[in-house]
Amino acid sequence: MRLTDIEIEQALDNGTIVIEPRPNNDAISGVSVDVRLGGQFRVFKDHTAPFIDLSGPSGEVQAALDRVMSEIIEIPDGEAFFLHPGELALAVTYESVTLPADIVGWLDGRSSLARLGLMVHVTAHRIDPGWQGKIVLEFYNSGKLPLALRPRMTIGALNFERLSGPVARPYNKRKNAKYKDQQDAVASRISQD
C-alpha cells in the first residue's frame, strides 16, 4: 500500500526513510514528498559516435558511451541549465534518499512541467528497496521552446509503497548494483550488464 502523508512524516521522523536534507512539511502532500533539482548535469555530445550497439561487447559499448557523454556540468545556484527541444540530459536530485528493504519508491514528474513538454524520467522511475543515494533524472524536452532548469527548483515527487516483507536482495547489498551510493549525474553503465 502507498504511504500517506502521515505515514511519510512518521517514516522520516523515525528514520525508516531518510531524505537529506530533510524536506519541510510543505513539501509533503497526500501521498508524496517533493524533490528538488540538484546542480549537476550531463549531456550527449552531438555526432561523436555513429551509433551505440547496446548488445555489443562491453568494451565497445563503454567506449561509445565515453565518446558521447559530457563530463559533469555544474550549475551554480541562481544560474540556469537550458534544455533545448529534442534534447536528452541527465541530472540529479538535490536530495539524497535512503530506503529500507521493505519499501519501494516511485518518482513522478510534475504535471505542470509535463504540460510544458518536460519529461523528468524517461522510463526509470522505480527506487528499489535498499536504495541509498541521489536519484538520477533523465530529462527530455518534447516541447517547442528551450526550458531553463535551475538548481533547487521542485522537479518531481516521490511516493512510497510498503511491501509485504523485506526483499532478500536490497539494492545496497547487491554486488552487481551499478548505481550504488550515487551522488552525481552518473552516466549509463549498461556496459556492466
UniProtKB/Swiss-Prot annotation:
Binding site for dCTP: 110-115, 128, 136-138, 171, 178, 182
Top-rank lineage group of the source organism: Bacteria
Active site residues of this protein: 138 (proton donor/acceptor)
Catalytic activity field: dCTP + H2O + H(+) = dUTP + NH4(+)
Record flagged with keyword Oxidoreductase: no
Region (Disordered) residue spans: 171-193
Pathway given in the UniProt record: Pyrimidine metabolism; dUMP biosynthesis; dUMP from dCTP (dUTP route): step 1/2
EC number from the UniProt entry: 3.5.4.13
Keyword Hydrolase attributed: yes
GO biological process, one term: dUMP biosynthetic process
Family: Belongs to the dCTP deaminase family.
Complex and partners: Homotrimer.
Function: Catalyzes the deamination of dCTP to dUTP.
HAMAP family to which the protein is assigned, alphabetical: dCTP_deaminase
The protein's name: dCTP deaminase
